[in-house]
Amino acid sequence: MGSIGSMGKPIEGFLVAAIQFPVPIVNSRKDIDHNIESIIRTLHATKAGYPGVELIIFPEYSTQGLNTAKWLSEEFLLDVPGKETELYAKACKEAKVYGVFSIMERNPDSNKNPYNTAIIIDPQGEIILKYRKLFPWNPIEPWYPGDLGMPVCEGPGGSKLAVCICHDGMIPELAREAAYKGCNVYIRISGYSTQVNDQWILTNRSNAWHNLMYTVSVNLAGYDNVFYYFGEGQICNFDGTTLVQGHRNPWEIVTGEIYPKMADNARLSWGLENNIYNLGHRGYVAKPGGEHDAGLTYIKDLAAGKYKLPWEDHMKIKDGSIYGYPTTGGRFGK
């Protein structure tokens, strides 16, 4: 449910705060350091204003910004773990909260492009989840495709947390993967501009409904002299309804109460529309246990490495050249 300005911890759930961080204008490493200081200051201020909050979420690109002319340069990249994540860890430990942070991560393989990474830090200051974006926003983003799968970790109030990053949320199979591994609160951190505002709202709701899990999503807000970033933090119930919807204001704090046990109970007790179960047990009324092979061609082809669309040979954009990226692969933009 919506927090109605609640400041206390709910009895059987937890209070979450999603920060509509102003889109950073970043031109130097000093600007990144300033962003980190601002994020830490905001984390402490949010905890002071909402003493019962247990999870604070910052959007994609809030640490390093979106300067596309420099975002691949060594000056702009960070390591995970690294001294910057240690600062975030110290803040979470001091505030006694879980925190979600965005990092453009230097690839350990210097011959490959960087990763777009999200981390969850617990109240003890430990990184308990590290996720690398599986589906960069092609053809704009130059990030290397993630290699850590979709991890799930324990969170506050009986939650099992997973994080997706921006365009990942448009891939329904990824939300299903998180739920299949036990996630009941699916976090989405984004740096979208207004072109996909409606689709953002739609997919946050559909990811919740299709998988009987809460979704908590937050986007950058404000104007960076090129695009406007819409903010609109959103918390969705496991039945796909919107519990809380933010506005387009930079610095808006979107809060809500989440009860993971309710999602767990729905998964255990629902018959109608328990679709995450039905996928692997279709027709279980007529056939005891149901049919376990979903019979979906694209799943079989994907598993076999043969995924190909009927119109794929005629597609006009299949690389990053429209944005000036080379098409030869390998590390570029140093």
UniProtKB/Swiss-Prot annotation:
Activity under varying temperature: Optimum temperature is 45 degrees Celsius.
Superkingdom, taxonomy of origin: Bacteria
Keywords from the UniProt entry: Hydrolase
Organism per entry: Helicobacter pylori (strain ATCC 700392 / 26695)
Protein name: Formamidase
GO biological process, one term: putrescine biosynthetic process from arginine
EC number: 3.5.1.49
Active site: 60 (proton acceptor), 133 (proton donor), 166 (nucleophile)
Database matches in HAMAP family: Formamidase
Complexes and interactors: Homotetramer.
Further facts: Asp-168 is probably not involved in the catalytic mechanism, but is probably involved instead in maintenance of the structural integrity of the amidase.
Domain CN hydrolase: 14-260
SUPFAM superfamilies, A to Z: Carbon-nitrogen hydrolase
Gene that encodes the chain: amiF
Induction cue: Unlike the other amidase AmiE, expression of amiF is not repressed by iron.
Signal peptide, first to last residue: none
Function: Is an aliphatic amidase with a restricted substrate specificity, as it only hydrolyzes formamide. Probably involved in the nitrogen metabolism of H.pylori.
Family, per entry: Belongs to the carbon-nitrogen hydrolase superfamily. Aliphatic amidase family.
